[in-house]
Amino acid sequence: MTWERANILAPATYAPLLKGADYVVHSMGILLEADYKGVLSGKESPISGLSRAFSSAKSGSQNPLTRKNGEELKPQEKDGPFTYELMNRDSAITLAQEADKEKTPAFAYISAAAAPPMVPRRYVDTKREAESTITREFPNMRSIFLRPGFMYDQSRAFTVPLAAATGVATMVNSASGGILGGMLGGFMGSAVIKPLKADVVAEAMVEALSDEKRRGPIEVKEIEELAEKGWRKGML
């Protein structure tokens, strides 16, 4: 593996790396926006910060589809680049656009099954917007959208207990026939969806990319099945 440094908002810094690529993967995103973090850290008043964090819409960058060749993505909000619209949506659309220019056979995007509790709905809405735009605008490139719930890994210690709690909620919801998630509506979000280890999602992504018939969204159950399929291949 070779590591390269690039700026996701500046396509010119990574476009040369896409030449001849078999696959391109977008795995970057933000869970909390800068203004939301400001409220939690006390740097901004709860009223002003939360009103902006939970606004129905924000601007991302200029339209990534009509930007000039090599033009950087320019944040349109005073919050800077840390909005769902820019980091979760526009950066993915731009990377897909650059990959399509290089006739990359397949593109994978790590999306999400739902927004976690207390996270603005725009978190998952912008991911769905990225999925639909990439599918519509780049039909000649096989695009895959993995939709995991909460992802965890031992390298990020704080995610392990959160995954355990989410796992319990998932089992309770399953045992109740989905009543828990249904009663609380969209509030529970990914808290009632089985958490997945990051390695499982990565294994599934590789397996999906290697299957030329595979395209479109892949939900949690299928992610697990693909990961197991890849694991079994590795054992042969």
What annotation goes with each model-predicted range?
Residues M1-T94, E98:
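NAD(P)H-binding glycine-rich loop region in Rossmannoid oxidoreductase-like domains
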Residues G20-D22, P105, M141:
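Short coil/turn segments at beta-strand junctions that form active-site/ligand-binding loops
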Residues Y36-G38, S45, T104, A163, ...:
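Residue-level signature of transmembrane alpha-helix interfaces in integral membrane proteins
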Residues T66-E85, A108-R128, T135:
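Catalytic loop of short-chain dehydrogenase/reductase
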Residues K101-E102, A115-L236:
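Oxidoreductase cofactor-interface core, primarily capturing Rossmann-like NAD(P)-dependent enzymes
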